[in-house]
């Protein structure tokens, strides 16, 4: 895989990320691994794997062991960095400065009430969990050669 297609991290632009992020991203870049390949090696999906790198998801003991192996990071060191609880939501300023992250917020801003209305009609009054939750990102190319991002959110419904 070309190094141009690898997500890397300039920690100076992300002051609120945990120390584990710098360690994980450095190993990822050094080994030239994509989130797809790391996810396959640890048995998680790409977004869940990336969330661990950004300190937004808790790594299990199994995740830590597999990440240490695939990234060639000392297990005890990685365990000490990842054994705590994530400090979710702190890594992005509001409003977001990154255009892609801003567009994700914009989608919720523009369609949030529409999502809510349709979900309430389908499921009744309740909420979609962001804890019992999974998400995927797929690439779709149409007949004209245009690339489309397909983002799926799957959350348990609570009444």
From Swiss-Prot:
Belongs to the cyanase family. It comes from Blastomyces gilchristii (strain SLH14081). Keywords: Lyase. The keyword Transmembrane does not apply. It comes from the Eukaryota. HAMAP family: Cyanate_hydrat (MF_00535). This is Cyanate hydratase. Its EC number is 4.2.1.104. The lineage of its organism: Eukaryota, Fungi, Dikarya, Ascomycota, Pezizomycotina. Catalyzes the reaction of cyanate with bicarbonate to produce ammonia and carbon dioxide.
